[in-house]
Amino acid sequence: MQFSKMHGLGNDFMVIDGVTQNVYLTEEVIRKLADRHRGVGFDQLLLVEPPYDPELDFHYRIFNADGSEVAQCGNGARCFARFVTLKGLTNKQDIHVSTAKGKMVLTLKDEEKVRVNMGEPIWEPAQVPFTANKFEKNYILRTDLQTVLCGVVSMGNPHCVLQVEDINLTPVNELGPLLENHERFPERANIGFMQVVNRNHIKLRVFERGAGETQACGSGACGAVAVGIMQGVLDNNVQVDLPGGSLQIEWEGVGHPLYMTGDATHIYDGFIKL
C-alpha cells in the first residue's frame, strides 16, 4: 500500500489514496501503523475516498492513532488538499469534500498555505454532543483534579475550551484526560487550553481525543477562537500560536462559516505491506 507522510504544524499524518488503490483498514491495523517504533507513526490517518455525491470531489475520512474514526480534523483537511493535488487526483483550486458530519471547501492559497471553510460552529449541546439543558457561554465541569469553567462547541467534533493564565504552567496532561472522558461528553471531547494574549492573538495547547496532546490541532484552534468570540474576549480575526506553529482563524459570528488558514507540508512517500 502506498502512502504519504505529511504534517500540519507538526500534527502528523499518514495519508492514503483510496481512490486509485483498494484499502481495507481495521482498528488493529491502524493501531499498528500508528506505532512510532514498529510502524509508520502518526497522530491521525487520513483516507481519501471517491465522492458519494457527484457534486463533490472526494470523501474525507479520519482515524485517530487508537483506531477510532472521527468526523473532523482541521490540520488534516489542509494536508488532504495538498495531497490530492500533489498526487494528481485533482487540479482544482477549490476542492469540495464530504466528511462523516458535513461538507467542507478546501482552497489552495500558494505552495504551502491552504484555507479551509470549516462550516458554522455548532453550539446546541445535544449536537456537540454535550449533556446540558441549554446552551450557555460558560459551563462548570467538576473533575477529581479541579473544577473548571469552559466553553463547549462542535466543529464537526466536540471541543471543550478553558481560558488559562499561562499555558506553560497548566497541567494539560493531567487535566486533559479527565475532561476528555468526562461523563458530560458521551463521545469524549478535545480539550483546548487557551491563553488570551490580546483580542487578536491567543496561545493554545490541545489535548486531542484519542491522541493526547499534539503539536497542533486545527479544529481545536477553530473551536477556541469561536468560544473566545462568543465569550466576548476575541475579535473576528485571530492568530493562534500552537506548539507546532501558527494558524489564522476568521469568524464573523453566528450564521457565518469559520475559516482557517495554515501550512500543509509533505514529508515523504512510502510503501508498506499490510
UniProtKB/Swiss-Prot annotation:
Its EC number is 5.1.1.7. It catalyses: (2S,6S)-2,6-diaminopimelate = meso-2,6-diaminopimelate. The record marks 159, 208 as: Could be important to modulate the pK values of the two catalytic cysteine residues. The keyword DNA-binding does not apply. GO terms for biological process: lysine biosynthetic process via diaminopimelate. One of its GO terms (molecular function) is diaminopimelate epimerase activity. It is found in: Cytoplasm. It comes from the Bacteria. The active site is at residues 73, 217. The keyword Thylakoid does not apply. Keywords: Amino-acid biosynthesis, Cytoplasm, Isomerase, Lysine biosynthesis. Substrate binds at residues 11, 44, 64, 74-75, 157, 190, 208-209, 218-219. The record marks 268 as: Important for dimerization. GO terms for cellular component: cytosol. InterPro entries: DAP_epimerase_AS, DAP_epimerase_DapF. Coiled coil: none annotated. It is an enzyme of class 5 (isomerase). HAMAP family: DAP_epimerase. Belongs to the diaminopimelate epimerase family. Homodimer. PANTHER family: DIAMINOPIMELATE EPIMERASE, DIAMINOPIMELATE EPIMERASE, CHLOROPLASTIC. Catalyzes the stereoinversion of LL-2,6-diaminopimelate (L,L-DAP) to meso-diaminopimelate (meso-DAP), a precursor of L-lysine and an essential component of the bacterial peptidoglycan. This is Diaminopimelate epimerase. The lineage of its organism: Bacteria, Pseudomonadati, Pseudomonadota, Gammaproteobacteria, Pasteurellales. The gene is dapF.
